[in-house]
């Protein structure tokens, strides 16, 4: 990774591969780009730009209160300019998809394609619906209450990990604690920032929605989600794709919210086919 000076802060950035540029916006808030590294093989067809949002991961120099949609999207566009790309394709997963939607609305002239992965256009699904869905799926009252506190930013930094572990299995179609432990030991080390999560859910995303503005997005758009995603379930994916002109919807079977790590080969295939088809149509 390289530290790049962007708008007075230091962003943690890694560029790899060759071909048309594709920036990948990670989820959270409070996480980093490592959750999207299973998509690295796309580097054989595209120039991939991984980075940590301000106040997230190993990016430095910004107060957590500066984590606004205005700054998050302006950071991304300044990164595009610094890397010398006239336009790029934008991929956003989870919270990164929220940022990607805002980017598409604020900088429509600077992206050519939009890919939304396990994300949504209205935070109600996370704040209110997700805990209720956990209850319907048989999670304990303690786990449901933990999720409600977590997704509304009602916790301290020290509670971040123990609280999330109470419902961590919900993120996956098939959850393996041993597999997660192996990823932490042998895989890239993620950098978690609990203060960003707390601010994000309690302030930044509180009441956030762009559902009434989806019709403004005109670029070719791909909406992808795991069938078992409890944060943004299939019924919301249908509404999200339906609100964007000519958006294509793909539901991935045997996958939850962490579809990039559960079904990386299938996600890569869908992304390749989407970008190739759009390119062919435009020739």
Name what the model sees in each region.
Residues 230-236:
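Conserved alpha/beta-hydrolase "acid-adjacent" motif
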Residues 217, 223-225:
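Short beta-strand/loop motif that positions the catalytic acidic residue
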Residues 7-61, 65, 79-80:
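Conserved HGGG/HGGXW glycine-rich cap/lid loop of the alpha/beta-hydrolase fold
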Residues 146-212, 219:
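Alpha/beta-hydrolase
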Residues 50-95, 269:
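Active-site loop/oxyanion-hole signature of alpha/beta-hydrolase fold enzymes
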Residues 247-283:
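Catalytic active-site module of serine/aspartate enzymes centered on a nucleophile-bearing elbow/loop
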Residues 86-130:
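Conserved hydrolase catalytic core segment
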Residues 114-153:
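Flexible "cap/lid" loop of the alpha/beta hydrolase fold
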């Amino acid at each position: 990774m390289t530290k790049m000076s962007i708008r007075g802060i230091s962003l943690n950035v890694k560029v790899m591969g060759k071909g048309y540029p594709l920036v990948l916006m990670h989820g959270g808030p409070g996480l980093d780009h490592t959750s999207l590294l299973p998509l690295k093989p796309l580097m054989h067809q595209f120039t991939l730009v991984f980075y940590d949002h301000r106040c997230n991961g190993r990016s430095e120099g910004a107060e957590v209160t500066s984590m606004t949609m205005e700054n998050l999207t302006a950071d991304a566009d300044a990164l595009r300019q610094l890397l010398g790309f006239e336009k790029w394709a934008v991929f956003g997963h989870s919270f990164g998809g929220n940022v990607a939607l805002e980017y598409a609305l604020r900088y429509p002239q600077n992206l050519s394609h939009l890919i939304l992965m396990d994300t949504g256009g209205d935070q109600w699904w996370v704040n209110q619906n997700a805990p209720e869905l956990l209850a319907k799926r048989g999670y304990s009252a303690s786990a449901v209450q933990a999720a409600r506190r977590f997704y509304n930013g009602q916790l301290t930094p020290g509670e971040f990990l123990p609280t999330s572990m109470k419902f961590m299995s919900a993120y996956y179609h098939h959850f393996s604690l041993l597999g997660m432990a192996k990823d932490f030991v042998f895989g890239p080390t993620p950098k978690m920032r609990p203060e960003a999560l707390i601010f994000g859910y309690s302030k930044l995303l509180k009441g956030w929605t762009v559902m009434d503005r989806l019709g403004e997005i005109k670029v070719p758009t791909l909406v992808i989600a795991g069938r078992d995603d409890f944060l943004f379930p299939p019924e919301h994916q249908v509404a999200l794709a339906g609100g964007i002109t000519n958006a294509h919807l793909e539901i991935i079977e045997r996958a939850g919210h962490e579809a990039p790590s559960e079904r990386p080969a299938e996600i890569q295939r869908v992304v390749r086919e989407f970008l190739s088809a759009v390119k062919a149509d435009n020739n």
